[in-house]
C-alpha cells in the first residue's frame, strides 16, 4: 500500500557481537509499541567507540543478518556501514527515512531503541534537538535500575522499558571468547559458529 503510515523500530548498535539481549529488547519493544518491523542498523565507524578496536563492519553486519533471520519482523540495514566517516544517529534516521520511502513508507513513525544509559546522554549527541523531532526514543534497561526520564527531555518523545535479558553484554561475550570460555546461549547458535569460523575476538593485541 503506497504512502501508508507505519510504526517502525530502529535498533542501532555496534553489535560486536550481537547477542540475545539485543534480540529480546527489540522483540519486547516491538510488542509494547505495536511495531510492524524493527530495523537493526550495525554502525560503521561509531564515534563514541573510536578508541576501541572493533570487528570489521562486514562481519558485524553478517552476524546481525544471521541472528535476526528467524524473526519475520526483523530486518537489517546497511545504511551506516555503507556511509563513510563516523556514524551519527541523525544520519542513520535520515537515510532510513529515504530507504523506507523507497518502499512506499513515506511518513513512518520511527522508534529508536537504545540503552537507557545512552539515552541519558542524548543531549550530547550530534544535533540532539533535531533528533528528538525525528523519532520517539525508547531507552531499555535491566531489572532493578531506576527508570527515570532524563531531565530536560520531552516526555512525549521518550519512553523507558525494563528488559530482563539485558544482563548480557557484548563486552562479556568478547571477554569470554578471549578467555576460551563458551558463549553458547548468550548469542544465537549461528553467531557462535560464525565467530569460531572467522576467528573473531581471539586476540588481545588488536588483531582479528
UniProtKB/Swiss-Prot annotation:
Source organism, top-level taxon: Bacteria
Name of the top EC class for this enzyme: transferase
Q: Which UniProt keywords apply?
A: ATP-binding, NAD, Nucleotide-binding, Nucleotidyltransferase, Pyridine nucleotide biosynthesis, Transferase
Q: Which Gene3D superfamilies match?
A: HUPs (3.40.50.620)
Pathway(s) the chain acts in: Cofactor biosynthesis; NAD(+) biosynthesis; deamido-NAD(+) from nicotinate D-ribonucleotide: step 1/1
User: Any idea of its EC number?
Assistant: 2.7.7.18
Q: Which CDD domains match?
A: NMNAT
- Chemical reaction(s) catalysed: nicotinate beta-D-ribonucleotide + ATP + H(+) = deamido-NAD(+) + diphosphate
GO MF terms listed in the record are: ATP binding; nicotinate-nucleotide adenylyltransferase activity
**Which biological process annotations from GO are given for this protein?**
NAD biosynthetic process
Instruction: State the family it belongs to.
Output: Belongs to the NadD family.
Its job: Catalyzes the reversible adenylation of nicotinate mononucleotide (NaMN) to nicotinic acid adenine dinucleotide (NaAD).
The name on file for this protein is Probable nicotinate-nucleotide adenylyltransferase
Lineage, broadest ranks:
Bacteria, Bacillati, Actinomycetota, Actinomycetes, Acidothermales
Amino acid at each position: 500500500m503506497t504512502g501508508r503510515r507505519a510504526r517502525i523500530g530502529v535498533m542501532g548498535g555496534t553489535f560486536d557481537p550481537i547477542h540475545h539481549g539485543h534480540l529480546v529488547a527489540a522483540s519486547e519493544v516491538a510488542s509494547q509499541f505495536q511495531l510492524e518491523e524493527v530495523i537493526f542498523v550495525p554502525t560503521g565507524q561509531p564515534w563514541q567507540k573510536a578508541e576501541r578496536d572493533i570487528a570489521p563492519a562486514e562481519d558485524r553486519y553478517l552476524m546481525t543478518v544471521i541472528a535476526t533471520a528467524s524473526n519475520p519482523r526483523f530486518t537489517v540495514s546497511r545504511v551506516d556501514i555503507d556511509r563513510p566517516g563516523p556514524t551519527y544517529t541523525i544520519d542513520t534516521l535520515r537515510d532510513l527515512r529515504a530507504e523506507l520511502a523507497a518502499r512506499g513508507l513515506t511518513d513512518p513513525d520511527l522508534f529508536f531503541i537504545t540503552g537507557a544509559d545512552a539515552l541519558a546522554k542524548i543531549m550530547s549527541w550530534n544535533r540532539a534537538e533535531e533528533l528528538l523531532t525525528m523519532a520517539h526514543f525508547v531507552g531499555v534497561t535491566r531489572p532493578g535500575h531506576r527508570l527515570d526520564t532524563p531531565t530536560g527531555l520531552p516526555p512525549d518523545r521518550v519512553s523507558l522499558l525494563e528488559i530482563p535479558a539485558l544482563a548480557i553484554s557484548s563486552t562479556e561475550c568478547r571477554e569470554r571468547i578471549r578467555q576460551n570460555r563458551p558463549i553458547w546461549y548468550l548469542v544465537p547458535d549461528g553467531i557462535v559458529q560464525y565467530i569460531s569460523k572467522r576467528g573473531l575476538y581471539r586476540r588481545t593485541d588488536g588483531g582479528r
